[in-house]
């Protein structure tokens, strides 16, 4: 079962994405901020990390930088953001994110992306 780390400070968005991912067959570990997310990255070794860019404390770009510095191989990182301009997409790419999803995230787009990344869940709709 593919392990997904979800770092999202908005409780409703986090729980909705968690439910969607679990329905698709993923093992989900969720965090409300970057510190908690990095702790989970160290202990759960996720294959994929969905990271909100606008986190409290340190933002998603800093999470990506710190995640890449962990001893274990970093997960595939997907940026979750309300910013959709080309320069925003370029910034997430430059920060090491594999993909950029604009919130609110479309469930089918997320399923297709995870399948494209080679991490389809057993019940994936994509």
Where are the model-predicted features located?
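Conserved phosphotransfer cores of two-component systems
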Residues: 42-44, 66-75, 95
């Amino acid at each position: 079962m593919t392990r997904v780390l979800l770092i999202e400070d908005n409780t409703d968005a986090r729980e909705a994405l968690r439910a969607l991912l679990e329905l698709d067959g993923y093992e989900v570990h969720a965090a409300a901020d970057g510190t908690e997310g990095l702790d989970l990255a160290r202990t759960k070794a996720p294959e994929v990390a969905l990271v909100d860019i606008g986190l409290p404390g340190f933002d998603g770009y800093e999470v990506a930088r710190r995640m890449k510095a962990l001893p274990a191989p970093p997960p595939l990182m997907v940026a979750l953001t309300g910013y959709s301009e080309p320069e925003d997409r370029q910034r997430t790419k430059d920060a090491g994110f594999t993909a950029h999803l604009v919130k609110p995230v479309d469930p089918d787009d997320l399923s297709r992306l995870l399948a494209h990344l080679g991490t389809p869940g057993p019940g994936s709709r994509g």
